[in-house]
Amino acid sequence: MAANQHLVLELFKSGEFKQRLIFLLAALFVFRIGAHIPVPGVDAAALNDFYQNSTNGILNMLNMFSGGSLERFSIFAIGIMPYISASIVVQLASEIIPTLKALKKEGEAGRKIITKYTRLCTVFLATLQGVAAAAFVYQQNVVVIGQIEFYFSTIICLVTGTMFLMWLGEQITERGIGNGISLIIMAGIASGIPFGVSQFLNVATNNLALALIVVISVLFLVYIVVYFESAQRKIPVHYARNSNSQGFLGKSNHLPFKLNMAGVIPPIFASSIILFPVTIIGWFRGGNNVGWVQKLLLWLQHGNSVYISFFAVSIIFFCYFYTALVFSPKEMAENLKKSGAFVPGVRPGIQTSLYLENVVMRITLWGAVYITVICLIPELFSSILGAGLSLGGTSLLILVVVAMDFSTQVSSYRVSQQYEQLMKKYNRDIVS
């Protein structure tokens, strides 16, 4: 505890860290303020009554990711999910369309163009979800203004809100601490914890044994997440250097590969894939769902076996997909060869590339299984108990992983500060 306090005091001596922390807190405060600014023309009391009586799992998940903005129908009601969906679409397209694939290889200039396409796709998807949200809310008889006026103002407010959150996330990443989009999602989820705690206390008073099981399960899942997120596969690497007297002398090192290289991206992407089409169908059909639409919405409710199966398959797919995006074994093998490094027992070049690819595929399988289990255990609890849990596996994973990433970022600032102090002392000694 004393060590943590000393770390905080040390960091606050750094002007840059203070500025970044203040910017982060201010940005998250703006996000929470925006989550309480309602879209004009809606009877807030009537809308609140509707959500209190709703058992729609899709709506509850959307509400979780938006930080409670959906139940208040605020300007951030559709949240950051259109941006996440757009990122999926553009990243998939960049693996299929030759023009986009070429842009990925053009460095910073290509990245800026791809970012522009992602933003345009975000506007398109946010508009679709804005229209769907307006249609859904209008069907609930909670609107107090004209239909055309309501649709126009709602779409403008929701699309603007999503684009603002996208911009805010980018600013946090650039000028704050950690990944902005992840921190916004985390802040939204964390805002629902007080309500979840109150629900849990109600359960605890009625069923102490169940409450104890839930507490033990949550603590165990947190431990598992921390353990697996810290797990690494270390591949030994030798660096050869020339020596006139003894030929080649080796210097040993290792390449650390995280068990979960994809982080929280797979469950977020999987949730987005499930939420977007079902939300569009359900919101446009309102309360008149019949036939296959009604059956589809029923299948994709939380706790349903079809939903659990589809969610699991989607998580595993995105684990492999995102890992393939962020890691190139061929490029790493080439870099090792150029630096005179080699993996013991493996020939440099293509053999090293195949070896690294094989290692990453194996650890990605274990990482995918781990994420899937963490995300699905609460879903299975919901199915068995016949009651929804306020803190799902995806929420728990995001909270713990983003918190760990934030802690890592803070530690890196500490190391950077110590290095700067060391360099200043060294320069003073040189001058004197």
Feature-to-residue mapping (PLM):
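N-terminal cationic and glycine-rich segments that engage phosphates or anionic surfaces
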Residues: M1-K104, A109-S432
